[in-house]
């Protein structure tokens, strides 16, 4: 299939489970409120975001200080100076957990300059949306109601969580299998859109009635609503994916 045919066959709504679709929605600063709303449905209460003051995608982030090349989908800093790495991982990758920690530690390291004290460090959160399921020791513990895992420093015997430093959050979207009728909460409806946006022909009536973050998320996925520059970039990204 040539590039012209690909452009002709663009779906009317982006697929949020693809890297290109995810980036089209969440790397757009006009959708900052959507990113905040989605993250606040996932993050622990102590990490709740009121606003984002810094916003950069992977094309702009060049300051991670290690020799190995790092590719970050989206990096945000809130008004409390907490850093959030947000990414879509479309396919399984070896040592993925290690990569997440590596990326987070690079940004954690950058928070201090020479002579600054460690109390000036702020938490770094990695939020990875996975379009596949991780391998778990006990698969029975993970299902459509339990598909988000939270990883941080914990004392083994007591279970006491250390002061927030680096946290890794995995969202295993393929474990979310609820039908529309089973989606009752805002959280459920949001992930139903994540799983099904690529198949929408128009914004469903139930989303129009629901409003809130679900409606904003669905509206942001509509390709016809993109401005000329964004649509062209999306088309190019789709041809190259």
Indicate where each model-derived feature is located.
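Elongated, amphipathic alpha-helical interaction scaffolds
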Residues: 1-241
């Amino acid at each position: 299939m040539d590039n012209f045919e690909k452009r002709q066959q663009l779906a009317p709504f982006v697929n949020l489970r693809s890297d290109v679709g995810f980036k089209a929605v969440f790397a757009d600063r006009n959708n900052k409120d959507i990113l905040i709303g989605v993250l606040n449905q996932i993050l622990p209460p102590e990490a709740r975001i009121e606003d984002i003051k810094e916003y950069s995608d992977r094309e702009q982030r060049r300051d991670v200080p290690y020799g190995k090349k790092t590719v970050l989908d989206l990096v945000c800093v809130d008004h409390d100076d907490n850093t959030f790495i947000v990414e879509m991982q479309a396919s399984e990758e070896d040592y993925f957990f290690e990569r997440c920690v590596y990326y987070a530690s690079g940004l954690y390291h950058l928070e201090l300059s020479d002579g600054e004290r460690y109390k000036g460090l702020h938490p770094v959160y990695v939020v990875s949306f996975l379009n596949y399921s991780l391998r778990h020791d006990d698969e029975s513990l993970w299902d459509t109601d339990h598909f988000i895992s939270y990883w941080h420093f914990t004392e083994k015997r007591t279970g006491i969580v250390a002061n927030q430093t680096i946290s890794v959050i995995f969202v295993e979207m393929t474990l979310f299998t609820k039908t529309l009728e089973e989606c009752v909460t805002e959280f459920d409806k949001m992930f139903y859109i994540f799983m099904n946006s690529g198949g929408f022909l128009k914004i469903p009536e139930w989303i129009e009635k629901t409003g809130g973050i679900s409606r904003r998320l669905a509206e942001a996925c509509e390709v016809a609503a993109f401005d000329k520059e964004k649509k062209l970039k999306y088309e190019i990204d789709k041809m190259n994916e």
